[in-house]
Amino acid sequence: MRIVLITGISGSGKSVALNALEDAGYYCVDNLPPHVLPELARYLAHEGQNRLAVAIDARSSASLDEMPGLIRALSHEHDVRVLFLNASTQALIQRFSETRRRHPLSGSPSHDADVGLLVSLEEAIERERELVAPLAEFGHQIDTSNLRANVLRTWVKRFIEQKNDDLVLMFESFGFKRGVPLDADFMFDVRALPNPYYDHELRPLTGLDQPVVAFLDALPVVHQMLDDIETFLVKWLPHFREDNRSYLTVAIGCTGGQHRSVFLAETLAARLSRQASVIVRHRDAPVAVDASSRLVT
C-alpha cells in the first residue's frame, strides 16, 4: 500500500494537500491519532484499498513521539512517504487572520486587543514547530510561504508520481528586492549579467518572452554562467541521492525576478530534466498563474 503522511505546521496547506490526494484517488483521513494508523492500513489493505493519505498535526501531540518509530515500522510493509509542510510565522499569522480561524494550540478564544491575539498566535505557532520538528527529517519538505494553492497541488502531484528513490529538483526564480527564498538549498546570484530591464522594449516583458530569450541567449557570459551552474549541479546530484534526499531547491536570483533569473531557471530546468524530476517556479515574475509553476518533462 502507498501511504502518504502529511504533517507540518497548521496553516501551511495540509488541507490543500489532502484534498489534492483525495482527487488523485487516495483514501484520506484528517487528524488521525498516529497509533491508529497501522490498524487502519491493515483494514484498508484487506478491503482492497491501496492508497491512503493521513494528515497529522500537533493536536495529536501525545502520540507524536511515537511517529519516527511508527514510520520506520510501516516502511517495512508499505511504500510510506512523508510530506512536511512549513511556512514563515509571518505568512501563517496572515493566513489565520484572513480566515479568522484559531490555531489548534492557541487555547480558548481571547478577547484581548489585536496585538495580544497576535502574540498568542505566534506562541502557538512556535510551540507547534517544536512538537513536529522531529518529523521534518523524514519528510519531503515544502515551504508554502509564497505558494498559491494551485501551485501546492502541482507539487503534491509530482510528489506522489515520483519514484520512491527519485530526486525532485525545483528551480525557483526570484527577485532580491523582494527577499530571498528561505527554503533554498542552493542560491545563485545572476545580477552580474546584462539586464534586459534597461532596454525599454524589453522592460515590460519577462524571461519567458521570446525577445528577452533572444537577448540573453545571444550573450556568451550568460551561457558561461549557465554552464558553470549546470556543471556544479550535475556533479553533486548523485551525492544528494546517496544521502537519500528527495527534494532539492535551486534558487536563481536577479534584481526584480522578472528577466534574467526567469530565463536561467527555465534553461537550467530544461538542461537538467534528464538528470532528475524537475519543477520550475517563478516567484516574482508577472506571469500567468498556470506558468508560475509547472512540471518539466
Curated annotation (Swiss-Prot):
Annotated protein name in UniProt: Nucleotide-binding protein BMA3112
Binding site for ATP: 8-15
Family: Belongs to the RapZ-like family.
Source organism (scientific name): Burkholderia mallei (strain ATCC 23344)
Molecular functions per Gene Ontology: ATP binding; GTP binding
Binding site for GTP: 57-60
Purpose of the protein: Displays ATPase and GTPase activities.
Any Pfam family hit: RapZ-like_N
Keyword Chaperone: no
Lineage: Bacteria, Pseudomonadati, Pseudomonadota, Betaproteobacteria, Burkholderiales
